[in-house]
A protein has these predicted regions:
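Short Fe-S-cluster ligation motifs
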Residues: 101-116
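Immediate flanking context of iron-sulfur cluster ligation sites
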Residues: 54-74
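Core of compact, soluble alpha-helical bundle domains
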Residues: 1-43
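Iron-sulfur (Fe-S) cluster-binding segments and ferredoxin-like electron-carrier domains
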Residues: 80-100
């Protein structure tokens, strides 16, 4: 996982995402375990099954939830980005191991943001 996170840090676009104060406060207030639950919920509802009509549009880019910002920063925001960066086919239904991997990447990034 460190290898992909380091690669993402070198991307001008991916490295431009950061949690603002409001998002950091939200993580602190809710707690990391609740944020992880949200991440699982978003990934299962928005990314598990590939939808050609929604892919690339399902994750807001505004600072509305820390998981959304993390998804853009970690290229887990849509199935096209997941395929390009994480080499998981965009047309297959994500299995539990793939969902765990995606959520762990998201959470590692959020934890890193909270520590910086």
């Amino acid at each position: 996982m460190e290898k992909i996170l380091n690669k993402l840090k070198k991307s001008k676009f991916r490295s431009s995402f950061h949690l603002n104060k409001k998002m950091r406060d939200y993580v602190t207030d809710k707690g990391i375990d609740v944020i992880k639950t949200h991440a699982y919920d978003f990934v299962n509802k928005r990314l598990k099954i590939y939808d050609t009509n929604k892919d690339g549009k399902q994750t807001p880019m505004r600072q509305v939830h820390p998981v959304f910002i993390a998804e853009h920063a970690t290229a887990t925001c849509c199935r096209g980005c997941i395929e390009k960066w994480h080499h998981i086919s965009k047309t297959k239904i994500l299995n539990d191991n793939e969902i765990d991997y995606i959520v762990n990447v998201i959470m590692k990034w959020i934890e890193s943001e909270m520590d910086s």
